[in-house]
Amino acid sequence: MRLLLSVLLLLVASLGLVSAVPAGSSITPPPPIEPIQWLSSRSTDSRRPWIRVRDWVIESIWGISKDASHHRSVKASPRSRSPSRSLTRYGSDVVLRFHLRNAEEAEALAEATDVLFLDVWTSTSEFVDIRLAQEVIPSLLGLLPDSLRTAYTPLIDNLAEMIYATYPTRRPAGFEDQPGFIPSMRQSTQFGDLFFRDYQPLSVIVPWMRLMASMFSSHVQMINVGVSHEGREIPALRLGRTRGQTADPYPRKTIVVVGGSHAREWISTSTVIYVAYSLITRYGKSQQVTRLLEDFDWVFVPTLNPDGYVYTWESDRLWRKNRQPTSLHFCPGIDLDRAWEFQWDGERTRSNPCSENYAGTEPFEGTEAHQLAQWALNETQTNNAKIVGFLDLHSYSQQILYPFSFSCSSVPPTLESLEELGIGLAKVIRLTTHEIYDVTAACEGTITADDQARNSPPQRPIFPTGGSSGGSALDWFYHQLHTDYAYQIKLRDRGSYGFLLPSEYIVPTGKEIFNVVLTFGKFLIGDLAQNTDLDWDAELQRTEPDEAPASQGDGPAPATQQVLQADVDDEETEWVENARSEFRRR
């Protein structure tokens, strides 16, 4: 079974690498690629059994004809062609990091970015990253106070090249002695890692999900949580014991993990898939993972925004919003993480459909956000489920954010438990992969305020255009569905690559969030997890020495994380053993 799984995953990956040619390109592709040689010493005839396996997979599981698959196999991947398309769109673009020192600077920068319709990549209490064309830099600086005109550093000056580098490279998917084998994968013991050495388009992700559900039907079910504006299903994998196996008068505890709300955040989609795969293949082999899938249903949504995700592969790699029309036909799209009903603040942005943060004209106008909300309500109201955990994966800046996002003046009733678990999640990342993730309220991670006096006027810079605010999925699940543990996790890195994180970081980032999920589930199991002989730490995934290097950031870690880093030698399970949250009394 393991050998068959490896073959099927390799086939999925090899088909996916050639399906990502941007549509409408005028570039002539190179000559057809020769069929992949699985073993260089074998003749063509000796490979016929593998061809039959491939054809069976294509025809029986994916519904793709042999002729169609052959047509796809001779097309060139994006990186096999010259990057003229990216150069045309992004040739003069750069990413600058502005360092904020006071509220006046933050407000001036926010106003300038609104006037010039600039793309704010991320914002924290210390800096704001902005993408803009080089020729626009003088105009931006002219709108800023003198103190900000020299308070910036260039992060990315070769944006077009970095965009192209994120697309898959056409390499033979063979054994480690074959040409094109990636040396960093030699130590991997997981066949699935071959699938995760590149980002994958939706045309590969959906068949892969279908394959997982077919091969692991005892604990995996493929579902869809809605339909996008352009008519695509929003696919998801449900992991856990089959419903109805045992009579259970209590609602089934469910944890939802979502990625890809913002189309350009490819690492979030790949990370959701990696974590799902790790749980799927460890069920029945790992007592810890088996326990998690027996105690909870896990619903993994790789991309909530399939229309936008497809658009990033076919047209614009840095597209953020969904693809539904607005009042301005040349500015389509709604920010799905501002479109939720709770504390929707579209009054600030609905007059500007060209804004990257456009919230629509009314709550839930964003189709995909409304679809997920309807699915979640249906699960809790009619399907005997209680959503007890919500993890919303984004990029970038390495932050673990808890409610509320809309305002720092409103304190969540379970604040201590949220902080406790959030610090525990950051700690397990630091101990296993040595990466530092900040832990704070979402309002502070995106529109920063004084974290010592939540009800007093903000003392640190406020930048109101970055990240979430009102209308976020995080706040809606926590407040409307009473999901006790809801987090938005911003993945790697801290700005060296931003949304263009190289594919060699997929597996290390996936390991970090797998460890987060393992720790998250252990915490929700509660005291019962401590009263067993299971060694939860033994199941944690650690970064191998030859894997991708640590993420590079700009500047030192925030003071709060320096305190956490000094706490490495504390008892690692103390935060779980002392937990007495409302969750376990409900």
From Swiss-Prot:
GO MF terms held by the record: zinc ion binding
Disulfide bond annotation, renumbered to this chain: 331-354
Keywords: Cell wall biogenesis/degradation, Disulfide bond, Glycoprotein, Metal-binding, Secreted, Signal, Vacuole, Zinc
InterPro entries, per database record: M14A-like_propep (IPR036990), Peptidase_M14 (IPR000834)
GO CC entries: extracellular region; vacuole
Domain Peptidase M14: start-end pairs: 198-524
Localization per Swiss-Prot or TrEMBL: Vacuole; Secreted
Family named by the database record: Belongs to the peptidase M14 family.
Stated name of the protein: Inactive metallocarboxypeptidase ecm14
